[in-house]
Amino acid sequence: MATQTNESFPLEKTRNIGIMAHIDAGKTTLTERILFYTGRLHRMGEVHEGAATMDFMEQEKERGITITSAATTCYWDDHRVNIIDTPGHVDFTVEVERSLRVLDGAIALFCAVGGVEPQSETVWRQAEKYDVPRIGFVNKMDRTGADFENVLEMMEDRLSANPVPVQYPIGAGDMFRGVIDLIEGKAIIYDDESQGMQWDVREIPDDLESKAEHWRINLLESVAEYDDELLMKYLDEDQEVEPEELHTVIRKATLNRDMTPMFCGSALKNTGVQRVLDGVTNYLPSPNDVPAITGHHPQDKEEDITRHPREDEPFSAVAFKITTDPYVGKLTFVRVYSGTLESGSRVYSPTRDEDERIGRMMFMHADSREDVDVIRAGDIAAVVGPKNLKTGDTICDPDHPVVLESMDFPEPVIRIAVEPRTKADRDKLTNGLTKLAEEDPTFNVRTDEETGQTIIAGMGELHLEIIIDRLKQEFKVEANVGQPQVAYREALTDMIDEHYVLKKQSGGRGQFAEVYMDVGPIPEEEEEESGLVFENEIKGGVIPKEFIPSVERGIESAMEDGPLAGYPIEGVWVRLYDGDHHEVDSDQNAFEIAGRLGFREAARHANPVLMEPVMEVEVVTPDDYMGDIIGDLNGRRGQIGQMGQRNDAQVINAEVPLSEMFGYSTDLRSLSQGRAIYTMQFGSYEPVPEEVASEIMDEQTMSATA
């Protein structure tokens, strides 16, 4: 394919969005429909083409269009829309997290029957963390039990959201026929035969006039809070509030995250999708509408550097996804925050402290790639060339280095041993695991030094099942898989003042390093940190500054092997406050050893405890089985939390150690005759009770000596 010149597309007409949803809310169907409608509009310039459209839909049903790339570019109403894929399953919340990090706005998708489900809450919290403005779409209005108003109430109760309908459904379930546009004051009835390409605009049906009036007043009152002029018009009965005025103020309130405009429809039945696209262009932000991104200088974390979404600023971008493409090899998806980048350029990776060369650059469409020669501020593109970039890394202009805010990924909580079935599979297994680990920052691979086994770790059983499946499908590797094991951690609970001297003299040059340090758990005010918080308070050069990083490196290596059972130590605070060195016998190696051995000594005396991953579990069950299920969760060391009702079912929330949840799917099926369902996601690491901890440590000792 010939390389296209990427003409500068107006930033104010660019939208970088994601679709956030629970696993069965209909995200794939909505995405397919968006790609279908925007694809026809972009290529043909005309949407209303009955026969061609229906042919395309037939193929679509056969092929099942899905977004396999991390980002897809499409066009709607003179706007360019980049859709960043966000998965729905809880084991993949990290995928959602990294998507939200680089998008500007989102469509929050809800099932009209299920409403706000556990994953909806998780994704909503992540969107709040990254200040992402949202519009909402209540999907599946054609399903039995669909209830638009119930979804709004659940959003208020469970998400503390402010949903403001700009539409109201005409009917529900089998009777769903269209929507009332509360801004225009008209009914929109969709034509089933035209695959949603044609609709009639009518007067509001008599039986819905009072409902429409109620929700229009709700819309006007909600919006009037954000604009004095509009408020005066609303209060003055002689003045009509124009649709354009409403759009302007709704946009302002949405960008400030004060409200979530709500749409409704059925993606499967092709109703309401174009209106959601209008909502994307009308209400969601362009790159110009979001604050400039702030990073820091690679050599000085205290020096803030700001990058605005302008082409005349130095180039900066974040790599948010790495994939392997069968045709072009390693693809790195980047979000450009400032400046421009031409193919063939060299960029600097401050996190790796090395240069990378950019080869090809391309925009990904639903079913094709578009090679371009330049990418600009606001663009989302895939690049070929970088060898060592990882997810979350910054790339920038070598003459203007900056580290943009990096992504924090949770540590894996479950691990299994894998081994190739044949010698021929060994290299393929190593190669496959390396590539998969490059793509997914929550998937770890390591070799157990004592047993020689390859250990893979991830966020849940499903996560690792999919990894094993991908090894088979993509890399043609057959692997034997061990039993899942919990990824325990260790933590320090007491503060220790450690003085350690390394002094070795064995003829010729010796080794000398002396350190004084406080070692203990991270203080409460810094609890968001999870690894090592290292504070350097050395004064007067008693330890030369070039040796300080060596002490930190030594501590980090010692943290990988805890004093209780050899599990990694989490949440450590160290203050290096004094020490000494020798002009000849001190070097970086000596201080690294002193840091490692000094920390190891301190950790033994800091009252270490074993920590286990505790999962947030939600079970939805008919009344009849509630007692048995609660009893079973208690038997798994579960702490029962909030209980309530959702539609006709009971909802039980509990916190349960991961070690007690293996095989729960089968047990729950037996307890409830297959009628209860559950979801589970990582909550936090908590201390293991003493009697359980001693069993785990005994097992670990036995396996180490076996």
From Swiss-Prot:
Domain tr-type G residues, every copy: 12-288
Bias (Basic and acidic residues) ranges: 297-309
Residue segments, region Disordered: 288-309
Binding site for GTP: 21-28, 85-89, 139-142
Disulfide bonds: none
GO annotation, cellular component aspect: cytoplasm
Subcellular location: Cytoplasm
Predominant place of localization: cytoplasm
GO-annotated molecular function: GTP binding; GTPase activity; translation elongation factor activity
Gene3D superfamilies: 3.30.230.10, 3.30.70.240, Elongation Factor G (Translational Gtpase), domain 3, P-loop containing nucleotide triphosphate hydrolases, Translation factors
Functional description taken from the UniProt entry: Catalyzes the GTP-dependent ribosomal translocation step during translation elongation. During this step, the ribosome changes from the pre-translocational (PRE) to the post-translocational (POST) state as the newly formed A-site-bound peptidyl-tRNA and P-site-bound deacylated tRNA move to the P and E sites, respectively. Catalyzes the coordinated movement of the two tRNA molecules, the mRNA and conformational changes in the ribosome.
Family the entry assigns: Belongs to the TRAFAC class translation factor GTPase superfamily. Classic translation factor GTPase family. EF-G/EF-2 subfamily.
Name of the protein described by the UniProt record: Elongation factor G
Gene of this entry: fusA
